[in-house]
Amino acid sequence: MVRLIHTSDWHLGRSFHRVGLLDAQARYLDHLVEVVRSEGVDAVLVSGDVYDRALPSPDTVQLLSDGVTRLIEAGATVILSSGNHDSAIRLGFASELLARAGLHIRTSLDLLGVPVVVKDTAIYPLPYLEPSVAADRIGADERTHAAVLRAAMGQVRTDAPSRAGASVVMAHAFVTGGATSQSERDISVGGVSAVHPDVFAEADYVALGHLHGPQRISETVRYSGSPIALSFSEADQRKGSVLVDVCVGALHAETIPAPVARSLAILRGDLTDLLRDPRHRAAESAYCQITLTDTVRPMGAMEQLRRRFPDTLVLAFEPVGAQTTPLTSAALVRERGDLDLCSDFLSHVRAGNAASEQERALLATAVECSRVVRGEREDEGAATTARGAA
């Protein structure tokens, strides 16, 4: 029996609507070190998207270095595989040397069928396989995600029978049945990205990465999800890591909740109600996404909201009863004059309240001034062209 922690999609260095997440990510790594110690974890598996960018900042690299060092010191073997956000070459630097210290980084196509063996359990870390790059090199029959994973799993199946213990596969892919969030980068190729879970048949456990919501695809196939929410679409998700006990023919998996540095709140309503409603008290200390439904857009809405909800990061307006027909289509624009278009826009943003006569007069003046300025610029351009021709 081997005890594993399955995690993925750390996205170290990412920001959340311009708010840096390094402190929250450091807190998660502190938590993970404690779990390794308290639960007697043999290996930590990180199934892709270790970094958020191909070229991470120095602080981000230092955070990863400190984190994996402490995990190894706590007694775990650490296995990282690259995801579609990672630079395989940069993440895989000095991987052979680091493996001797207990840090196994798999980013290469050359070791797909070569496992990391932990207590007789063969762990096969498959990096993200970009079909256009991997297909020919690993003998896939077509350039799709399903084909390259089938080819990679063919190498795993060739090796696995020679091993005495269970087989565990790490992969970074979109597997059929998984639910997406707003924060994943699309990996579709020609509109085809999903891989059927049957491609992993015969593995005792499959530790998936890429989708940020924790979910079980089958009894043996799971996404750990990202340990930290990366979009407001993940507000209701229970973030964590999967603690897995596995041996041949036996599997037990449970979620270990991750610490929540800051909760997320999604609020909707008119400005007055949101500022007064006591039911929103918990949102006062959360990162907030707020949609205002006032029929007339309030002045200084963000400033007012931030007096109660100081960490309002996203503000949208969806007025009740607002016109939903797009006003910017080519047909509508061609049929309307400049003054009418400006008046229509003013009415649109004010939920149908048309411009007054005084406002139309101001708009008419502004439109005429813009025509004069535009005409002067065109005249200057024509003169410059004429001089150049001369």
Where are these regions (language model features)?
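Catalytic-core regions built around general acid/base machinery
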Residues: 63-75, 192-202
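Accessory, non-catalytic peripheral segments of nucleic-acid enzymes
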Residues: 38, 43, 246-390
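A conserved active-site cap/scaffold subdomain adjacent to cofactor or substrate pockets
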Residues: 197, 204-260, 266-267
